[in-house]
A protein has these predicted regions:
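Intrinsically disordered, low-complexity terminal tails of fungal membrane proteins
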Residues: 1-46, 238-255, 466-482
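Symmetry-related core transmembrane helices of the 12-TM Major Facilitator Superfamily/SLC fold
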Residues: 181-183, 211-232, 339-348, 443-463
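Glycine-rich segments within core transmembrane alpha-helices of 12-TM secondary carriers
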Residues: 91, 97-99, 151-158, 173-210, ...
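A membrane-interface helix-boundary motif in multi-pass transporters
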Residues: 115-116, 201-220, 330-337, 431-453
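Structural signature of the two symmetry-related core transmembrane helices
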Residues: 85, 116-132, 333-352
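Conserved MFS/SLC helix-loop-helix module at the cytosolic interface between two early adjacent transmembrane helices
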Residues: 100-142
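Membrane-interfacial loop- and helix-cap regions that link adjacent transmembrane helices
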Residues: 52, 69, 73, 232, ...
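Intracellular juxtamembrane helix-capping segments at the cytosolic ends
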Residues: 72-76, 131-132, 155-171, 197, ...
Length: 482
């Protein structure tokens, strides 16, 4: 084998040493970070344009018109179609192709850059709306399957680039708040989508599919994605409020070096510990979508797309602030974060099992909030708990991984692996729920069993979380405040 170049070897060594995650690693003093004095002296929009806050807002806008619209369609149950099976198959293809890209997402994002990776993803946003429109109105099902596969390939770029930015752009002390803001903006798109769904479909009290015109409005929103992506600043030009830059060490690594570094990340203990939690974190999407489609009316499903994100937005903002509270150590906050979603989700699985026993597996139930509000609320509440606390699951995993983050390049690799695990779970979930002959209680049972496997992984992972944030970061903040 040829000898590694200096940049390759140093990058690989960094991965092998920095990420062993000794709880006291972050207590070691590091070199004083480079502060951009010109940025601190600047004022007005030019300063704001390069700020972390503006980058988070832009990522929120991209998510608003991209993944958020996809969620609004998915939250209808079965993509808003009359049965869930075609939409679940399309979503399966979306996440299978996405998992292939995210697996190598770290090297790809490191070579292309966060900004242009996001731009590539935004170009495929309109394909989703057009696919559902043609399927709902003209029955062109093959097109839906093709475009969701293409969208999955490009969405993989956004999954890795946005998550990498969320973990490395903000200062450690503000990361939870920015994660909450980003998640809230994603759900704001789902709120808009939910309002559109409900206004168009609120008169439809029976089972079936939503009005095809719904998808045209979504398509129009998706067409704006590339604008927000082009406004992003390159990572090297992003500045935190104290004038520091995101750590860009390990630059100019060759493709061979990137793949070697990715392999080093894949062998780390934290990568394997996060596999099951990441696989589980989005698994509920297919399971809950099928539950909603089988047992609720079109009006109830449209209402759900509005209720779920409206509840989620304040929840993720509060959750983000909780993750940033300095009165507790990072590890204590990680324990609190775990309990906040594990307990309600475990209870919801039991509740959903009882509801399936009452409702059976037919598609003729059509529970409706107007015709029978009490029975609708009783069956809908566990669904709502699963979806809203599901965002807490994802935020807590992002935040925990952020405590291990060192530089943008290495974080992109670990994030790529994390999102590959996540999309793999989503693909399996929607794949199980795309089989019309399979009892829908089987995917629910698989989902419930996964939470039992999540617990030991999360317990071990949290024990590796550093007790304190970097001391230099603490001293730097004090100097800036002074």
């Amino acid at each position: 084998m040829a000898a590694a170049t200096p940049s390759d070897s140093s990058d690989t060594i960094e991965l092998a040493t920095t990420h062993q995650h000794n709880p006291h690693d972050h207590d070691d003093h590091k070199a004083e970070p480079d502060v951009d004095r010109a940025y601190l002296a600047s004022k007005g929009f030019p300063k704001f344009f390069r700020s972390v806050l503006f980058q988070i807002i832009l990522f929120g806008c991209i998510s608003f018109v991209g993944p958020s619209i996809f969620d609004a369609i998915s939250n209808l149950g079965g993509g808003g179609l009359s049965t869930p099976y075609l939409a679940n198959l399309a979503t399966t293809l979306n996440y299978v192709s996405g998992s292939l890209v995210t697996l190598f997402g770290g090297p790809l994002i490191n070579k292309i850059g966060i900004k242009w990776s996001s731009f590539i993803a935004s170009l495929a946003f309109p394909l989703v709306g057009s696919g559902y429109y043609l399927s709902a109105r003209y029955g062109v099902d093959w097109y839906l399957l093709v475009v969701t596969t293409i969208n999955g390939l490009t969405a993989g770029f956004l999954y890795v680039s946005s998550t990498t930015a969320m973990q490395t752009y903000p200062d450690q002390r503000d990361r939870g708040w920015y994660l909450g803001m980003w998640s809230a903006m994603m759900n704001s798109g789902a709120v808009v989508g939910g309002i559109i769904n409900f206004v168009i479909n609120y008169r439809r009290s029976g089972a079936g599919g939503v009005a095809w015109f719904t998808y045209l409005i979504f398509l129009g929103l998706e067409c704006t994605g590339f604008i927000w992506a082009l406004l992003l600043s390159p990572t090297a030009r992003v500045r935190r409020k104290d004038g520091t830059r995101p750590d860009l060490s390990g630059r100019n690594v060759t493709w061979k070096g990137e793949l070697e570094a990715l392999w080093a990340h894949a062998r780390q203990k934290t990568s394997w510990l996060v596999f099951v939690p990441a696989f589980y974190s989005f698994f509920y999407g297919g399971t809950m979508g099928t539950y909603l489609t089988l047992h609720f009316s079109v009006r109830a499903r449209a209402l759900s797309t509005m209720i779920t994100p409206m509840c989620t937005i304040p929840m993720v903002m509060v959750y983000g602030k909780l993750l940033d509270m300095q009165r507790w150590s990072q590890r204590t906050r990680a324990w609190m974060a775990l309990c906040s979603w594990v307990l309600p989700q475990a209870a919801s699985f039991v509740w959903l099992g009882v509801e399936y026993h009452k409702l059976g597996t037919s598609t003729s139930t059509g529970l409706d909030p107007v015709l029978d509000s009490r029975r609708w609320a009783e069956a809908y509440l566990p669904f709502l708990i699963m979806f809203t606390t599901g965002y807490w699951t994802q935020l807590s995993l992002y935040w925990i991984l952020g405590t291990f983050a060192s530089d943008v390049k290495s974080t992109a690799r670990s994030t790529g692996l994390f999102r590959a695990f996540t999309t793999c779970g989503m693909a399996v979930s929607y794949g199980l729920n795309s089989d019309a002959s399979l009892d829908p209680r089987v995917p629910l049972s698989v989902n419930a069993a996964l939470i039992a496997l999540v617990l030991p992984c999360m317990i071990t992972l949290i024990r590796l979380v550093p007790e304190k944030i970097d001391i230099q970061s603490e001293e730097r903040l004090e100097k800036t405040s002074a």
